[in-house]
Amino acid sequence: MAVSRFTGKTLNRLAFEPLGTKEKVWFTISDEPNEKYLLKMSRPNTGEHWSEYIACQLCVLLGIPCAEYEILPCETAESHVKRMAVVSANLIENGFMMIMGNEFLFQRFPEKYPTPEESKNSREKRHTVSMVKESLTSVLIKPAWNFPDYFMAFDVFCGYLLLDTLISNQDRHHENWAVLYEECSQLYYLCETYDHAASLGRELTPEKRHILLTSKDKGQQLSTFVNKARSELFEYETDKKPLLTIDALKLALSYQDNNVKTYWINKINYLTEYEIQEILNKIKDEIMDKETKEFVLRMILENKKRILENVN
């Protein structure tokens, strides 16, 4: 089920996580004292908890390496008020260090990319698809991911952009991807994708969702709405706006062999409405109501249609 196995357990707080804009805290539980977990609070009146969970489950279906998320209702100081959160395991194994995209790009291209201190803003025009591709040239992928032998790190990253297009994720900025550095071997590995809360229209009001599903005005329809989704990746650093999610995906795949595109398009083609509905059915109605589930289902299917029509 979507609700976390940690429900009802006492969490032993370790430290706050400073990265990002949301409330986050690292914790352990008595059953697993050596395992660290990250609890990320959902902001009030948003669906950040269910959008994160749904994105994770879609990754499982598509074979995209992803941080695993579970929904956790949390008690607050006011006993009658519950806050929603998601819980994920620590992605950094012993002997590894996580390097965020902005820091890694600066390490690779110190003459081209700003320092992490200079690039605090999530929107950085030098965060281009081609620069990300070039930076990942010598980065490995984990054998446990079971990709075809010809797959390289950027081929997997194309899968991350496929996910972004499918869920209208508009937050693939340069701190929302990372590599893992193994200290003993001095090798770099691509990190699993993470942080997909800014997706699936989680910020929309029920009224807005209803309009998008029922309006006869093309400008107010779901197909028009999803066409506006933008990535935080650019084609050229002189561009005024970042790429649309579909264009970031198309550009990334255009750099790769055709068999990489075929691999990912087949994954999308085989994704069924039934499988998506099953993900939504695992979320209790008090966490995500039926109308919102219907909207999210239609949104994912609309994005699937866009991918199949535009990536060829």
Mark where each language-model region is.
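Short, charged/polar micro-motifs that form catalytic or ligand-binding hotspots
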Residues: 42-49, 147-148, 152, 156, ...
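Active-site acidic catalytic loop and adjacent metal/ATP-binding pocket
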Residues: 155-198, 300
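Conserved ATP-binding subdomain of kinase catalytic cores across diverse folds
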Residues: 1-120
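C-terminal catalytic region of ATP-dependent kinase domains
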Residues: 60, 182-312
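Short alpha-helical "patches" and their helix-cap loops
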Residues: 68-77, 173-183, 312
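Short glycine/proline-enriched turns and hinge-like loops at secondary-structure junctions
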Residues: 50, 171-174, 204
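ATP-dependent phospho-/nucleotidyl transfer catalytic cores
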Residues: 92-161, 184, 274, 281-286
